[in-house]
A protein has these predicted regions:
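Conserved short alpha-helical segments that host acidic/polar catalytic motifs at enzyme active sites
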Residues: 1-216
Length: 219
């Protein structure tokens, strides 16, 4: 089972994400990664860092990155579709790299969705089922310019179980989450808001948590 964690607030996001991911290593994993919101205005973008193996390897790589990002999402993966590799590790991104997503669950109709999306010009980088979500959200965002509305629209096309969190470089400080037959909790602490697939990931940050359905979490 995959692990999801997210944070938006005033603290350094990478430290919080790594702590949460390490707490969820008991769920099993073959790779891990984070997406961090970096820059402001026209310079805003997402930094995506992924590693195969233990979260400690990701932590080591992040320790060499001077990042003051205060919003991001992270993931530990247990492979279901696609072999363990950096390319198949989460987060997955849209074609333009402005949207990133982490997901726990199985998308039953991913092959059909992938074929349709590729037919509309989307380029897939991984073997995973999760990546279809990134492209579905990207398509919807081109129309809505609203991350949460785009996540809702993407979910209408998916058959299967999912818990997901998404960020967009054009909506700083916002994490959109949705779930169906897969756990996601949202917590509020003194310095920000948190998202996780397991409450144990948030135990150091807050005890004020609720089960999520579909919502946007902001600072």
């Amino acid at each position: 089972m995959c692990g999801i964690v997210g944070y938006t607030g005033s603290d350094i996001a990478k430290n919080i994400l790594v702590t949460g991911l390490k707490r969820m290593e008991y769920r099993g994993y073959d790779s891990s990664g984070v997406a961090l919101e970096v820059g402001e205005g026209a310079a805003a973008h997402l930094d995506v860092i992924r590693r195969v193996g233990k979260v400690a390897g990701l932590e080591s790589e992040l320790s060499n990155i001077d990042s003051d990002a205060t919003c991001g999402i992270g993931h530990t993966r247990w492979a279901t579709h696609g072999r363990p590799s950096v390319v198949n590790a989460h987060p997955h991104t849209s074609c333009d790299g402005r949207i990133a997503i982490v997901h726990n669950g199985i998308i039953e109709n991913f092959a059909e969705l992938r074929e349709e999306l590729e037919g509309r010009g989307h380029h897939f980088k991984s073997e995973t089922d999760t990546e279809v979500f990134a492209h579905l959200i990207e398509e919807a965002y081109a129309e809505t310019h609203d991350l949460m509305a785009s996540v809702r629209e993407a979910c209408t096309h998916v058959v299967g179980a999912y818990g997901l969190a998404a960020v967009c470089a054009d909506e700083p400080g916002v994490i959109a989450v949705a779930r169906k037959d897969s756990p996601i909790v949202v917590g509020v602490g003194e310095t920000g808001s948190y998202v996780a697939s397991d409450v144990i990931a948030l135990i150091d940050a807050t005890r004020d948590v609720v089960a999520a359905i579909t919502l946007a979490v902001g600072r």
